[in-house]
Curated annotation (Swiss-Prot):
Methyltransferase required for the conversion of demethylmenaquinol (DMKH2) to menaquinol (MKH2) and the conversion of 2-polyprenyl-6-methoxy-1,4-benzoquinol (DDMQH2) to 2-polyprenyl-3-methyl-6-methoxy-1,4-benzoquinol (DMQH2). This is Ubiquinone/menaquinone biosynthesis C-methyltransferase UbiE. It comes from Pseudomonas savastanoi pv. phaseolicola (strain 1448A / Race 6) (Pseudomonas syringae pv. phaseolicola (strain 1448A / Race 6)). Its EC number is 2.1.1.163, 2.1.1.201. Pathway: Quinol/quinone metabolism; menaquinone biosynthesis; menaquinol from 1,4-dihydroxy-2-naphthoate: step 2/2; Cofactor biosynthesis; ubiquinone biosynthesis. S-adenosyl-L-methionine binds at residues 79, 100, 128-129. The gene is ubiE. NCBIfam families: MenG_MenH_UbiE, PRK00216.1-1, PRK00216.1-5. Pfam families: Ubie_methyltran.
Amino acid sequence: MNDQRKGSDAEPTTHFGYKNVPESQKAEKVAEVFHSVAAKYDLMNDLLSGGMHRLWKRFAIELSGVRTGNRVLDIAGGTGDLTRKFSNLVGPTGQVVLADINASMLKVGRDRLLDLGVSGNVEFVQADAEKLPFPDNHFDCVTIAFGLRNVTHKEDALRSMLRVLKPGGRLLVLEFSKPTNKLMSKAYDAYSFAFMPLMGKLVTNDSESYRYLAESIRMHPNQETLKSMMVEAGFDRVTYHNMTAGVVALHRGIKP
């Protein structure tokens, strides 16, 4: 977090993309972005990743170890890609909670999953990752895919996720990260700051939201920093896997 004070009584600031804003305003500004993009979120994911996001999520599911009867929390679950798969894995004796802080994204996810016939073992909850409204030691697995970079206090969110996991439970963080070679990094910068806003303008008439998304990716901690944050939060056996030359990384940690 970028905590800056202009005086002893000044409110701490944090980054919103490349801008510094008062901490109390970040959640509202992020909400505005996702209210704007919710209706075409799936379409834009496919266009901007060339469908690769489905492969990244599939790998996260394979590494989750989720099985019949488990309880799973899908934070920032959005339109429900992971929740849908987990619903099949846990079966009628398990439970999946799709949690999202954004009401528009939550509605799109609920409507989409109901249209696909996913119900019975899925619950939808509007929740803040920093203050999860669930009991201690409740879930076998917690996932957050492409959501942690939008959280104001990432350390608080990681500790909240640790709290709700059962001992031995797994946290998986799937997030855009730092490319592992200079050529990919340069190409990815050009793609992110030129192509993403352009596609946002053409498809959703909203280039600014996609400019923020590109900036938020650059401001997110790199692979080793996020690993250290997870260890500091209390997770054991923290590892990460780079995908697409580090454009995306999947971090995994275990609750002791």
